Structure formats: C-alpha cells, structure tokens
Amino acid sequence: MNKWQELTIEVNREVEEAASNILIESGSQGVTIDDSADYLENADRFGELYPEVEQVETVKITAYYPESADIEAITKQVNDRLDELTDFGLETGDIHLVTQELVEEDWAENWKKYYEPARITHDLTIVPSWTDYEASVGEKIIKLDPGMAFGTGTHPTTKMSLFALEQVLRGGETVIDVGTGSGVLSIASSLLGAKEIYAYDLDDVAVRVAQENIDMNPGMENIHVATGDLLKGVTQEADVIVANILADILIHLMEDAYRLVKDEGYLIMSGIISEKWDMVRELAEKAGFLLETHMVQGEWNACVFKKTDDISGVIGG
C-alpha cells in the first residue's frame, strides 16, 4: 500500500489561494482547505448538520506528497515562499507548519469530504469531478478536480470574476484568460456563450491542470491553453480579458490589455486587496479604461473596466 506525506500550514485567510498555489508548485499531489467560514456559509445548504464552529481569521491548508518526497526540504521551500508573500502586500500571519505520514486510502477519501457542489452565481455551479450531479433547468455545470486547487471557484476573487463574466458575456465573444490556474474562468466563459477562449499561465503545472479540467467538461474545444507571461507577445484581440491574479502583477498588463481589448470591450480584474485598489484603478484609467463595475467581498476587490468613449455607463460618468 502506498504511503503519502502530509504537510499542513495555517495562514491568514487572505492568502488562502496564493498559499495553495505555492503548495501545488512545490510538488503536492492535491490540497484540502479547512476554513471555518465555509462551515458557517454552507450550514444547512445541503441539508447536512455541521458542528458548531467558531470563525477564526486563519485557514488550514493540507498538502499531500509522495513518500519519496524530501518533506524537510519542501517545508523549508514552502515557508520561504510564504514569507515572500508579504512583498505583495499580503499578510500571512503567524505561519504554522506540521507534517505527518498517512496511507493512500486515507488521503483518497479524506480530501474529498471537503468539497460539495457549490452554486456560485445564478447560472454557474461548480461540481467536483467525482460527483454525480443533476443540473436544474438553466443551470450550467463546471466540473473541476479541486485536488489541484488552482482556484476552485469558491474563493471570493474567483466568485467575483464569475459574476463579472456573467455581467458582460452575451454570446459570440473572444475571451483571453490571463493566469488561468484551474481553467475555471475559461470553462465558465465557454458555458456563458463565448466563441473562442485563449487561456494563459506562466506556470506549466497550471497549464496542465487547466487542460485536464477543460477536458472533463464536454464541448470545450473552443478553449486554447498555452504557457504565457501575462499578455507578452499576444496579438489576438479580444472582446473580454479576465485576470484573477495579485494586484502587483495586474499592474504590468494594463497597456497590453488596452492594446488587445476591442472598442467597447472589457477588462475584468480580481485578486486585488483593498489597500491596492486605488493603485490598480489609477493605472487602468491611465491606460485608457473607464470603470464600469466595482465589487468588494471582505478584503478583496474585483472590477470591470470598459474600453469606450461613452462615459454615460461608467462610474463617475
């Protein structure tokens, strides 16, 4: 029977997605996230009873590695990279790391219990890949393998990105998804009627994961995934560009985004902590975009900017 090594970290909730990505990039075969806020938000949602849980500001993220992995070296690497998140204005809080061994059958079942189908927007529901789920009339299903956890649709930044896509897509558009991660925004774009979607990520692991998730959703032949550094070298124009990445990275794509977005097209950005919002808005407007929608959930901000000369439908217009 195969054995696995388990690494659990406890960090502030605001770095949940970034920390999950760090664990995946360190070689983890999957992660689970234990967040007290999820118990409170989902209580009675699926007709289940949850234990009483006190909401705290931290989350526990558990990653799983093969028995052969050098867990001590991985722990040091993860700790160093978590420390670097403060350079992006993110507060990790006091970092706690714990390791232990477990057998494969324990992992195979344990991590799955954290995931249930989740209706994210009016139209879109995220369903774990192993779950049989019957959609209601008009409900659009996104099948994901949350074990790879590059944004499973439940994080506030991803939720707001999905709401924004619902807002702007009417059918027939070309979409560029920058920093695609799990591919969830590309899959959603296709379900919402986009004609062609081009998804890019700098990380080869994310590109592979995105393609695997896309392949488990039927009718996604219009999504094209490739390795790419933001929008560098991209010549394909788009009706919509969506980017759910950290603010300090978003600021480097503004000019390329304005170059590629068609007139009357949109730039959707998420992953912006509150203290970075003014900076992102200023640089987007300096590039030529006008703010149409601003969304806030907790410390996270998302926005829809439009490339237009008509100021009547924009904030401040």
From Swiss-Prot:
* Reactions the enzyme catalyzes: L-lysyl-[protein] + 3 S-adenosyl-L-methionine = N(6),N(6),N(6)-trimethyl-L-lysyl-[protein] + 3 S-adenosyl-L-homocysteine + 3 H(+)
Q: Where in the cell is it found?
A: Cytoplasm
Enzyme class, first EC level, given as a word? transferase
Could you cite one Gene Ontology molecular function of this protein? protein-lysine N-methyltransferase activity
Q: Which UniProt keywords apply?
A: Cytoplasm, Methyltransferase, S-adenosyl-L-methionine, Transferase
Which biological processes are named by the entry's GO terms?
Answer: methylation
- Chief place of localization: cytoplasm
Q: EC number(s) in its UniProt entry?
A: 2.1.1.-
Positions contributing to S-adenosyl-L-methionine binding:
158, 179, 201, 244
Gene Ontology cellular-component terms listed: cytoplasm
Indicate yes or no for the key word Metal-binding.
Answer: no
Q: Which NCBIfam families match?
A: prmA (TIGR00406)
UniProt function note: Methylates ribosomal protein L11.
> What family does the Swiss-Prot or TrEMBL record give for this protein?
Belongs to the methyltransferase superfamily. PrmA family.
Q: Which HAMAP family match?
A: Methyltr_PrmA
Protein name (database record)? Ribosomal protein L11 methyltransferase
